[in-house]
From Swiss-Prot:
GO cellular component, one term: cytoplasm
Known EC number: 2.1.1.192
Gene that specifies this protein: rlmN
InterPro entries documented for this protein: Aldolase_TIM, Methyltransferase_A, RlmN_N, RNA_MTrfase_RlmN, rRNA_lsu_MTrfase_RlmN/Cfr, rSAM
Catalytic activity: adenosine(2503) in 23S rRNA + 2 reduced [2Fe-2S]-[ferredoxin] + 2 S-adenosyl-L-methionine = 2-methyladenosine(2503) in 23S rRNA + 5'-deoxyadenosine + L-methionine + 2 oxidized [2Fe-2S]-[ferredoxin] + S-adenosyl-L-homocysteine; adenosine(37) in tRNA + 2 reduced [2Fe-2S]-[ferredoxin] + 2 S-adenosyl-L-methionine = 2-methyladenosine(37) in tRNA + 5'-deoxyadenosine + L-methionine + 2 oxidized [2Fe-2S]-[ferredoxin] + S-adenosyl-L-homocysteine
Annotated Radical SAM core domain residues: 100-334
Disulphide-bridged cysteine pairs: C107-C339
Listed name of the protein: Probable dual-specificity RNA methyltransferase RlmN
Main location: cytoplasm
Length: 347
């Protein structure tokens, strides 16, 4: 029976060093291989030109490098780029490059499909197949960084975990990927340029705070009225608003990092005074800002963008209470790359 080889990128640098020592080689070989895997983005052991042929053969016999492949790439009329990324087992996720005049942002996926069941999101209609490995997350960023340099002549400036999946339900792998992205041996990006978005997994928000992470936190809130929130995001019955509020207060107490609430206003759902007042009240519990996001409809038409007047009612109420609020217009709608639209048909 053939033994399945392990993805070498699942090993830490210390584990790689130990592997070489156990196999009667020098520990520094682990450093060389680690640099090839992360700093240089090697997809094959044959790429490792300063490693001896015998050592490369030993690696081939024991490990694989499970790298991703950009299957298809689409460019929007507004400059947005969407990648359909094929994983080593044939599954596909999507990632997006969002350019503006001052920055280029990578929107990356953390799961194949999604663990949650938000009724307004196309990704949530996909069955969750599996979590992404740290290397698969890292490779999405690497691919978008290359595209940013190619198309916009500048490196990637920001990363948001707002693609397919709930990042906090793949917590360990997301953290490992971010550690490599921010490491001098990886991309060397500041954690302050990284935002992890969650739909409100309270216990994991507390864990992040305890782990003293340095990246930013965004919460897809969409309603501060429990009944409405439970209807549009059924899983939130397990994470009620008082529990979420407590977790966010704990986060701010530990990190002193302001929270961003992501909020879509829908016609006939949360475009009413009760919802506006509830959001204002919820925002007063912890320093925050609110992004009011343009809705990107999916096929069935159940959810519709609220009127500009309804959105302005939110802005006026929030600003009157000293809360920063901005309307975020979606990018890449013509290629289904906008928020809530990622749902590759091949999955």
């Amino acid at each position: 029976m053939q033994i399945e080889k392990k993805d070498i990128r699942a090993l830490s640098k210390d584990q790689l060093r130990d592997f070489f020592v156990i196999n009667k080689d020098k520990a520094f070989r682990g450093n060389q291989v680690y640099e090839w895997l992360w700093s240089k983005g090697a997809h094959s052991f044959e790429d490792m030109t300063n490693v001896s042929k015998g050592t490369r053969q030993m690696l081939v016999e024991n490990f694989v490098i499970n790298h991703i492949k950009v299957d298809t790439m689409q460019r929007s009329s507004d400059g947005t780029v969407k990648n359909a990324v094929r994983l080593h087992d044939g599954l596909i996720v999507e990632s997006v490059l969002i350019p503006t005049e001052t920055r280029t942002t990578a929107c990356v996926s953390s799961q194949v499909g999604c663990s949650l069941d938000c009724n307004f999101c196309a990704t949530a209609r996909l069955k969750r197949m599996r979590n992404l490995e740290p290397g698969e997350i890292y490779d999405q960023v690497l691919a978008i960084d290359r595209e940013s340099k190619l198309y916009f002549n500048r490196p990637l400036s920001n990363i948001v975990f707002m693609g397919m999946g709930e990042p906090l339900m793949n917590y360990n792998n997301v953290i490992k990927a971010i550690d490599m992205i921010t490491s001098s041996e990886g991309l060397g990006m500041s954690p302050k340029r990284i935002t992890v978005s969650t739909s409100g997994v309270s216990k994991m928000i507390k864990k992040m705070a305890d782990d003293e992470v340095k990246f930013k936190l965004a919460v897809s809130l969409h309603s501060a009225v429990e009944e409405i929130r439970n209807k549009i995001m059924p899983f939130t019955k397990s994470f009620p608003l008082p529990e979420l509020r407590e977790a966010l207060q704990y986060w701010y107490h530990k990190t002193k990092s302001k929270i961003t609430y992501e909020y879509v206003v829908w016609k006939g759902i949360n475009d009413n005074k009760e919802s506006v007042d509830a959001l204002v009240k919820f925002c007063k519990h912890v320093p925050c800002k609110v992004n009011l996001i343009e809705y990107n409809p999916i096929d069935d038409g159940e959810f519709q963008q609220a009127s500009p007047e309804s959105i302005n009612a939110y802005i006026k109420a929030l600003e009157a209470n000293g809360i920063i609020a901005k309307v975020r217009h979606s990018r890449g709608k013509d290629i289904d790359a906008a928020c809530g639209q990622l749902a590759n048909k091949e999955i």
